[in-house]
Amino acid sequence: MHVTIEYVIMIPLLILGTFLFPIFANAVMNTWVNSRQTLALQNVAGQLGSAVQQLYFSLNHDSVPSGTVTYSPGLPPFIESSFYMGDATLSSSASPGSSPSFLQLTVTLVGTSNSVTTTVILGSNVLWQPSIFMSNSTDACVTAQKFSNGTILLWFGG
């Protein structure tokens, strides 16, 4: 009699466990993969933002003549077999004059919902040309053009 009661209790639990374990394991793995991809995107966004800022500050000096500089940041073309895209928007602070401009950089992993944003502080003499950074492009780069009046135009190449 006791054996029958044990089977009545254990068989449904085993069947339930057989279905619940894969569902639970899938949910945990999805969370882990999304976290890992987001961390990699944050790293890429930080490096790309740093490249833009360094390019700007390198040209933003009176001793540097007007001209164009292109920099390839050496970022990986893929994050876990997916390429990513970078986009940026320039905004100025409310007060005119020598106030800084802010470049909001958004990097998105294509094929996923993962996206990160970082902000880069630049000077008041900067312009941004709308462009997209494509990680899988062979000529993915950041380009800066300094004009004779000291204005620096930045954009993504590739």
Predicted regions and their residues:
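Aliphatic-rich helix starts adjacent to a transmembrane/signal segment
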Residues: I5-G46, F57-L59
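Short, glycine/small-hydrophobic-rich surface segments
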Residues: L55-F78
